[in-house]
Amino acid sequence: MADADASDRVRTLLLRGDNLLKHGRSQDKAREAFEEARNVAQEAELDEPVRQLIERRLEQLA
């Protein structure tokens, strides 16, 4: 996956997770979106600040 594609995918997954939480939907589904974003970011070796943002989202659900 190209960096631009990976960045777009991570952005989409973060928005999905945030929207699920914002609208009181399943925390499990939000966690799944954030975990998938983490995997995409790691595989594409995206910048550390992006990965830290994802980790913060996951920590908020712990």
Language-model features, listed with the residues they occupy:
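Glycine-rich phosphate-binding loop at the start of an alpha helix
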Residues: R31
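Conserved structured catalytic cores and adjacent interaction surfaces
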Residues: A37
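Acidic, Ser/Thr-rich low-complexity linear motifs
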Residues: M1-S7, L46-R56
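Alpha-helical junction/boundary sensor with strong preference for TPR arrays
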Residues: G24, A41-A44, E48
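Alpha-helical linker/edge segments of TPR/alpha-solenoid repeat scaffolds
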Residues: R56-A62
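N-terminal acidic leader/helix
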Residues: M1-D28
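Residue at a conserved register position within TPR or TPR-like alpha-solenoid repeats
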Residues: L20-L21, A41, A62
